[in-house]
Swiss-Prot record:
The keyword Glycosyltransferase applies. Its EC number is 2.4.1.15. SUPFAM superfamilies: UDP-Glycosyltransferase/glycogen phosphorylase. InterPro entries: Glyco_trans_20, Trehalose_OtsA. UDP-alpha-D-glucose binds at G22, G23, R263, K268, F340, L366, V367, A368, K369, E370. CDD domains: GT20_TPS (cd03788). The gene is otsA. It catalyses: D-glucose 6-phosphate + UDP-alpha-D-glucose = alpha,alpha-trehalose 6-phosphate + UDP + H(+). This is Trehalose-6-phosphate synthase. D-glucose 6-phosphate binds at R10, Y77, D131, R301. Belongs to the glycosyltransferase 20 family. PANTHER family: BCDNA.GH08860, TREHALOSE-6-PHOSPHATE SYNTHASE.
Length: 474
């Protein structure tokens, strides 16, 4: 049986428990355990890139990690992946900071990683590449004679042509993506956006619904909405509360709790969310003294100016809202800029009456799914969810809102706070059914199954070389 080789920017080391490593690690480890294989990625450390790979083997899985030099980390990761691709793919061209040296570094590191992986590959390996850090990776492997089946999954949104084509190197990136055999996206909108971008660049021939030829390469596109481990989350949420949390729950027994958690990022719509909560307090004064909104937003990429700006903005807004609406004995908004243990968050989800998840743009947003999975089915909370989160395509029984419309979000919060138990149970059951069906294992099994069905390029190379491509005609 073919091995599975997984390549991602970071790897979850074997001594890190899967539950604490997050959803992606759970899915990848499940796929690797089923097939056996290799997980290849950055160690998270800087140092001499010429050092041998660090390898750890446990069971039928090998972890191979490498260091990056300070320059390569800065150019490949900070200045291109996170300062160009991340904002552009989240529709924030105003935050893109394109620099040619960073682009050169991005290509250089992808080539370097291909060189490091090449000696580890076997002829029948199936290769699965993850996320925007590694868009050119298949292209680099093909240049080195690798004809194995190579799949790619994009965890973040793919932008429309008006956005993507503004990147100075958009054409090169699109051509490089065609070197994958299978391109997986979170939503149908993302898949179609990629094909629209490609069609603007060159002629795309669609042989069947999702099989295409462009730039002289044949490839498939498909949608694979990533899932979670609902049973594990329910188990974590239902366990006994730590003493401090139990005390807090007792103190707030007569208060309805609105809860949000995500890392501090401009794509999450936190300033807009604070203003929507203010609109709730203004338009629905009957809730004064009876609700509390808690926002947990641990710092991420704190050295980037855009992230520093949003942190200061949120701190100012939280103080202003509390100063305007707070009363003796009641603070309407708690903003916590710190990290909390994931298991503890599942317990907080369970006793929260409303889960507020309103990103301005998100590939999927697993927090929305985790909130649903953590609820008590007999007395569940209500999910208020942005229409621009990939999860909105599946969790249609949530209260779907436009995060840019503060009045709509405020009205949804009021509805959630006053919703009957029967309606809450019905909505939760419908969403939980979807989450259980499309869990993390279903996600990885579908992707790997589809990738295995593709004929390796070594068997099709002569036929593909005969495919003519033409530029897009005006």
């Amino acid at each position: 049986m073919s091995r599975l080789v997984v390549v991602s920017n970071r790897i979850a080391p074997p001594d890190e428990h899967a539950a604490s490593a997050g959803g992606l690690a759970v899915g990848i480890l499940g796929a690797l355990k089923a097939a056996g294989g290799l997980w290849f990625g950055w160690s998270g450390e800087t140092g001499n890139e010429d050092q041998p790979l660090k390898k750890v083997k446990k069971g039928n899985i090998t972890w191979a990690s490498f260091n990056l030099s300070e320059q390569d980390l800065d150019e490949y990761y900070n200045k291109f992946s996170n300062a160009v691709l991340w904002p552009a793919f989240h529709y924030r061209l105003d935050l893109v900071q394109f620099q040619r040296p960073a682009w050169d570094g991005y290509l250089r590191v992808n080539a370097l990683l291909a060189d490091k992986l090449l000696p580890l590959l076997q002829d029948d390996d199936i290769i699965w590449i993850h996320d925007y850090h590694l868009l050119p990776f298949a292209h680099e492997l093909r240049k080195r004679g690798v004809n194995n089946r190579i799949g790619f999954f994009l965890h973040i949104p793919f932008p429309t042509p008006e956005i993507f084509n503004a990147l100075p190197t958009y054409d090169t990136l699109l051509e490089q993506l065609c070197d994958y055999d299978l391109l997986g996206f979170q939503t149908e909108n993302d898949r179609l956006a990629f094909l629209d971008c490609l069609s603007n660049l060159t002629r795309v021939t669609t042989r069947s619904a999702k099989s295409h030829t462009a730039c002289g390469k044949a490839f498939r596109t498909e949608v694979y909405p990533i899932g979670i481990e609902p049973k594990e989350i329910a188990k974590q949420a239902a366990g006994p509360l730590p003493p401090k949390l139990a005390q807090l729950k007792a103190e707030l027994k007569n208060v309805q709790n609105i809860f949000s958690v995500e890392r501090l990022d401009y794509s999450k719509g936190l300033p807009e969310r604070f203003l929507a909560y203010e609109a709730l307090l203004e338009k629905y004064p009957q809730h004064h003294g009876k609700i509390r909104y808690t926002q947990i937003a641990p710092t991420s990429r704190g050295d980037v100016q855009a992230y520093q700006d949003i942190r200061h903005q949120l701190e100012n807004e939280a103080g202003r809202i509390n100063g305007k609406y707070g009363q003796l004995g009641w603070t309407p908004l708690y903003y916590l800029n710190q990290h909390f243990d994931r298991k503890l968050l599942m317990k907080i989800f369970r006793y929260s009456d409303v889960g507020l998840v309103t990103p301005l743009r998100d590939g999927m947003n697993l927090v929305a799914k985790e909130y649903v999975a953590a609820q008590d089915p007999a007395n569940p909370g209500v999910l208020v969810l942005s229409q621009f989160a990939g999860a909105a395509n599946e969790l249609t029984s949530a209260l779907i809102v436009n995060p840019y419309d503060r009045d709509e979000v405020a009205a949804a919060l009021d509805r959630a706070l006053t919703m009957s138990l029967a309606e809450r149970i019905s909505r939760h059951a419908e969403m939980l059914d979807v989450i259980v069906k499309n869990d993390i294992n279903h996600w990885q099994e579908c992707f790997i199954s589809d990738l295995k069905q593709i004929v390796p390029r070594s068997a099709e190379s002569q036929q593909r070389d005969k495919v003519a491509t033409f530029p897009k005609l005006a």
